[in-house]
């Protein structure tokens, strides 16, 4: 079962991306390095509720 998740920047808190994940194979929160336009660099983005 795939669900939509929102990814927020860990440095500025801006919610920049929407992605999907499979809850059965990845029950924990998703973390990805993505580009943050507010910080103008690649930062760690975490799944938010």
Curated annotation (Swiss-Prot):
List the Gene3D superfamilies: Ribosomal protein L33
The biological processes this protein is annotated with in GO are:
translation
Signal peptide (residue range):
none
The answer to keyword Ribosomal protein applying to this record is yes
User: What's in the GO CC field?
Assistant: cytoplasm; ribonucleoprotein complex; ribosome
Q: Which residues cross the membrane?
A: none
Q: Which UniProt keywords apply?
A: Ribonucleoprotein, Ribosomal protein
Coiled-coil intervals, chain numbering? none
The family database entries (InterPro entries) matched by this protein are listed as: Ribosomal_bL33, Ribosomal_bL33_CS, Ribosomal_bL33_sf, Ribosomal_zn-bd
What family does the database annotate?
A: Belongs to the bacterial ribosomal protein bL33 family.
The record's section on PROSITE patterns has: RIBOSOMAL_L33
Name of this protein: Large ribosomal subunit protein bL33A
Any single GO molecular-function term of the entry would be:
structural constituent of ribosome
Q: Which NCBIfam families does the protein's record reference?
A: PRK00504.1, PRK00595.1, rpmG_bact
Q: Does the keyword Lyase apply?
A: no
> The organism sits in which domain of life?
Bacteria
